C-alpha cells in the first residue's frame, strides 16, 4: 500500500480516536458529573433562595432591635444592608433569572456571612491606636431612613465615647453602583490616625467552577495593569500582595457577574488577594487599605469609595470607566487574546440588535458585513488556488527531477512560483483571517451577559448554550435522551452539510493527501463543535452559505 495512503488512514483514525476518546473519557464523565451537581444545586438552591428571603425578612421585622437593615430598592437591585457592621450582604439582581425555567428565582449575588453561599462587601476604617474606638463589625449604625433607592440616599451616623463623630452617606444608582462617603469629625483633643479599607469576602462554591477559557476569581487594575488570579492560583499561593500602588479597582469576577471595590482616587493603597480555610470552608478575599491619615483635633476628613455589584454589561462598564476614570474596568469581561477584535465584534452585534431586537439575526447581519469586507481577499485566494492547481504537473516534474537534492528542489519550486506570480500561501489567507474572527464571536457568545438566555427562533432559547436537540432521538420525537457525546443537533448538522457543499464548489487542493484529509473535515467538525454555543454554529452555517454564494459568483465570473 502506498505510504501516502497509509499516512492518510493513520491520520484519519488518529483524529477520530482523539475526538471520540476526548468526548467519551473526558467530556462525557465531566458533563455527567456537572449535570448531577447542577441538578442537586438547582433543587437545593431554590429552597435556599426561599429560606434566605424569609430569613432576611424575619431579620428585618422580628429582630430589628438586634440586626437592623436598610432595604435596597431600585429597578436593578433588591436586598438590604446590615446596620450592624455596615455590611453589604444581601443583594439580588432583579433583571436576571438563574435559568430559563418559568419559576426560576432571580440571581442572588451577596449573601450573609452565616449562610452557605456567604458573599459580602464592607467599607470601613481602622486605626493603629488601640486606645481609639472606631466603628467595627459589632457597631450598630443609626440611620435616617429605612430604604435606600436611587432617589433617596441614606445617611448613617455613630459617635464614639470620645465624642468623635462618624458619618456615612450611601447612594445607589439605577444600575449596580453604590457610592459610600465616610466623614470623620474629630471632636476630641487628640490627633486621630485612620486608614480607610474595603473588602469583599466570599465562600468558595465548587459547583460554580468553570472551564479554563475564561477568568473567574480575584481580579483588578493595579498600577494600570490588569491582575488576574484564578481561585486555584490564590489557593496555591495563599495570597497575592501589592504594596502601595495605584488601585483603580479590585474584585471577584464570575462568568457574568462582578463584585468590585473602587477606592478614592486621591490616594494610593495596598491591595491583597487572599485565601483562607476557616471552619472547614474555603474563603477568598480581596481588600485594600490606605496609608495612615492623621486628623487634627477639630478637623474632619472625608473619604469616598464605591462598590460595583452586578451584571457585567459591556456598555455599563464602559460608561462607568469613562464617567469615573476607572482604568480597564471593561476588562472584567474576559474578551481574551483577541480583545482588539472581540470588543468591536460585540459592538457591531449590539448595534444591530438595537434595530432588529434579536442577537441571532444580529449575528447573521455581522457575518454578511465580514464576508463583504473579505470578498476581495477570497477572490485572490481562489485565483491563487487555481494557479497552484495548474502548476501541479510542473511541480511534480521538478520533484521527480530533484528528488535527492532538497535544497535545489526548494529553489526550483520557488523560482517557478516567482515566474508564475503565485503566492503558495495565498489560498490560506481567508482561513487565517477568519480564525481571530471565529474566536472573537465565540468569546462574545460565551462571556457577555447580553448573550445569556438570548433566544433565536424555533427551539433555540439560548444562543450561549449548545443546540439542545439531537438526531439520535429524531430531534425529540423519540422519548429518550442520548448520551452527551451523541447530542448532535440540527445546527451542527447544517454546519457540516454547508461546509461539505462549500468544499465541493471550491478548487481542490493541489496536494492529493491534503485534499483527502479535507474531505473528512465536515464530519470531524460535526462531532467536535456539537457542544459549542449554538450561536457560533449559526454564524458558521450562515458563513458557509454565504461562501457558497460567493464561490458561485467567483466561479461564474472567473
UniProtKB/Swiss-Prot annotation:
Entry membrane topology: Multi-pass membrane protein
Record Gene3D superfamilies: 2.70.98.90
GO molecular function: membrane insertase activity
Keywords assigned: Cell inner membrane, Cell membrane, Chaperone, Membrane, Protein transport, Transmembrane, Transmembrane helix, Transport
Chief location of this protein within or outside the cell: membrane
InterPro entries per UniProt: Membr_insert_YidC, Membr_insert_YidC_N, YidC/ALB3/OXA1/COX18, YidC/Oxa/ALB_C, YidC_ALB_C, YidC_periplasmic_sf
Localization (cell): Cell inner membrane
Record-level GO BP terms: protein insertion into membrane; protein transport
Membrane-spanning intervals of the chain: 5-25, 332-352, 355-375, 429-449, 474-494, 520-540
Pfam families from the UniProt entry: 60KD_IMP (PF02096), YidC_periplas (PF14849)
GO cellular component term of the entry, any: plasma membrane
HAMAP family reported in the protein's UniProt record: YidC_type1 (MF_01810)
Quaternary context: Interacts with the Sec translocase complex via SecD. Specifically interacts with transmembrane segments of nascent integral membrane proteins during membrane integration.
Family classification: Belongs to the OXA1/ALB3/YidC family. Type 1 subfamily.
Biological role stated in the UniProt entry: Required for the insertion and/or proper folding and/or complex formation of integral membrane proteins into the membrane. Involved in integration of membrane proteins that insert both dependently and independently of the Sec translocase complex, as well as at least some lipoproteins. Aids folding of multispanning membrane proteins.
Name listed for the protein in its UniProt record: Membrane protein insertase YidC
Lineage of producing organism: Bacteria, Pseudomonadati, Pseudomonadota, Alphaproteobacteria, Rickettsiales
Gene name of the record: yidC
